Amino acid sequence: MRRITTLFLALLLTLSLTACGSTAQPNPPAQTGNDASQTETPDTAPEPAEEPEKPQQEPYVISSPTVDRGTVDGVTYVPWDGVVEHLFFHPIVAYPELAFDGDSQADGIDDWMVTVDEYGKILQSVYDRGYVLVDINDVWSESTDANGQPVMIRNTLYIPEGKKPLIFSYDDVNYYDYMLKDGFTYKLILGEDGLIWSYGLDPQGNEVISQDLDAVTILDKFVREHPDFSPFGAKGSLSLTGYQGILGYRTNTDTKVWNDELEANRLKECEAVKPIIAELKRTGWTF
C-alpha cells in the first residue's frame, strides 16, 4: 500500500519514473516545490533490486535398506529378516499444564498421548538400544500372485550390523481445533532457514515458534544430532484423517456453512501447506 501511495504522489508531482521488469524498485525520496520540476529522466533504467536470497536447502539423502552395501565407511550392512518393530504416536503434549487441567479432555489425553519430555526420552531410549529408522514402504513391496491378485511381499533389509529396524508412525496430524486449547501446537510452518518449525501459543497466549514442542520437529532435530539413527534417511509415516484439513491448515470443506470467503481461505490454506508437504517428503517423511 505504501508503494502505491508513493507512486501516486510522484505522478501528481510529475516525477518521471522508469520501471524495469517485474521486480519492485526502491521508492525514491519524496520531492516538493521546484525540485520536482527539475528532476531529469535518467538515461538508463535503474538496476532491479536484488531479491532476498532464499535459504539453501540442506542436502538430504534417502536410500533403500533393501540394497546390500557390504561395508561402507567402516560400517558393515547385514541382512535382517526378523521382526520389524513399530512405534505409533498421537500428537504430543507441548504444555502439560493445559492438557491436564481437569477438563473433559484430560483423561483421554493422558490415556493416548505422551508429553514432549516423554517423547524425547522414548527417542533416546530406542536410539540407545540400537534401533534405526526404516521406511515402512521399504519393508514390504506390493506384487501380484499367479491369479493376478495383489499381494504384499516382505523384503530383506540390509542394516548396519548390530542394529535393529524400527518404524515410526503418527496419527491425527491434522491439529484439530478442539486440541489447540489443550496444550498442543497449532501447525507446522516453514522457517526462514528452510527447516520445518511448529507454531502455537504458550499458556500465557504468546506466539511460540519452536523445534522442541512438536513430534515432527523434535524427530527432525534428533536425527540431525544423531544421523546414525536414520542411516537411510527415513523419519516416519504421517497419517491424516481428512477431518479439519492437514498439518494445521484448514483445507477441508466439512462445515455446515459455506460461502465464498471460506472457499477463498481454503484455497489459500491449500497453497500455504504445499511447501510444508514438499519439505517433509524431501526429508524422509511419508504420508
Give short role names for the model-derived ranges.
Residues 1-6, 21:
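Positively charged n-region of N-terminal signal peptides that target proteins for export
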Residues 5-14:
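Sec-dependent, cleavable N-terminal signal peptides
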Residues 6, 27, 33, 49, ...:
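Generic hydrophobic/packing signal
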Residues 16-19:
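C-terminal motif of bacterial Sec signal peptides marking the signal peptidase cleavage site
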Residues 21-28:
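Bacterial lipoprotein signal-peptidase II cleavage site
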Residues 33, 37-85, 96:
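N-terminal low-complexity, Pro/Thr/Ser-rich intrinsically disordered segments
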Residues 79-286:
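Active-site beta->alpha N-cap acidic-glycine motif
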